[in-house]
Regions:
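Alpha-helical transmembrane segments of multi-pass membrane proteins
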Residues: 1-216
Length: 216
């Protein structure tokens, strides 16, 4: 896993390094561009941390990794997409509230999800799937909003900034997924969820600076 992480970091540097070098003057002088990269990287890594930890926990509930992967990935992405749609009609001022809710929700899951799963292990399979989807509905709605909120904060007409947002989010998702897998192997899903919550704290803090500066 560590070897895979090093390879992913090297590939990311190879892909993003040249354009970053070409934009080094803009990045050095335009703080908002750097802040936006940190914001979208944080929510990308944090989302993957939640996804992987929930897959691990729901494997216990659903009885097989294949079921957990299918239900969690499908459910989380679908509900996150729904959250993105909802965010398009909400005031931008709500983004901070959503991020704070995400921090608290993920931290709460770290301490309550596994004990809750143990209490419903004796229910029927269909019921367990319904329980899983209910959890994912709440998580997906909340975690699906910050990306769209960030894009709206940047301004969709700022094409270069939006492109960097997608790039940093994708790169952080790939590298973050590997990091959180390592964390779960050595420390378990609770620590992984707390790490994901910390990533959303970073997003919460950077979002204020992102909204407070004009991008040239």
């Amino acid at each position: 896993m560590f070897y895979c992480l090093l390879v992913l970091i090297a590939l990311t540097a190879l892909i993003l390094g040249p354009p970053l070098w070409a934009k080094r003057k803009d990045i050095a002088t335009e703080q908002r561009l750097l802040v936006s990269m940190l914001y979208f990287g944080a929510i990308g890594a944090g989302f993957m941390g939640v996804e992987l930890a929930v897959v691990q926990i729901m494997t216990l509930l659903l009885g097989h990794p294949t079921y957990a992967l299918s239900v969690v990935i499908m459910g989380l992405l679908a509900f996150a997409g729904l959250g993105s749609v909802v965010m398009q009609s909400l005031p931008l001022q709500r983004v901070d509230m959503v991020l704070l809710a995400g921090v608290l929700l993920i931290a709460g899951l770290a301490f309550t999800l596994l004990p809750f799963v143990h209490t419903v292990l004796d229910t029927g399979f269909v019921t367990r799937i319904a329980i899983t989807l209910s959890v994912l509905l709440v998580v997906g709605l909340v975690l699906g909003m910050p990306f769209v909120g960030g894009i709206r904060t940047l301004g969709e007409d700022r094409e270069h900034a939006v492109a960097w947002a997608w790039a940093c989010n994708g790169a952080a998702s790939v590298i973050g997924s590997n990091i959180f897998m390592i964390v779960m192997v050595f420390s378990g899903s609770r620590v992984a969820l707390l790490g994901a919550s910390s990533a959303y704290i970073i997003a919460f803090l950077t979002r204020r600076r992102l909204a407070g500066r004009a991008l040239s």
